[in-house]
Amino acid sequence: MSYEKVLQAGKIVIGTKQTIRALKEGKAAEVIVAEDADLPIIEKVTAAANEANVPVTKVDSMKKLGKACKIQVGAAAVAILR
């Protein structure tokens, strides 16, 4: 599952703004988005990933995604860097 991918990834960026920045700079290899995030956030990140031809994986929980990133709060989006 994608939570394990995040745990095993060498370099990640956490959060919507940083994820979109990594996509625009061509640094993201994969994007993980939490399905319980606000719809406009999901759409914005997904659109940026599609534009950059980067695969998007959806997970069910912001809280679990944040935990996989070793932070104490939820994460709406995470990019695994190249």
UniProtKB/Swiss-Prot annotation:
The protein's name in its UniProt record: RNA-binding protein GK0100
Family: Belongs to the eukaryotic ribosomal protein eL8 family.
Keyword Heme annotated: no
Molecular function in Gene Ontology: RNA binding
UniProt keyword list: RNA-binding
Transmembrane intervals: none
This protein's record includes keyword RNA-binding: yes
NCBIfam families associated with the record: PRK13602.1 (NF010125)
Domain of life: Bacteria
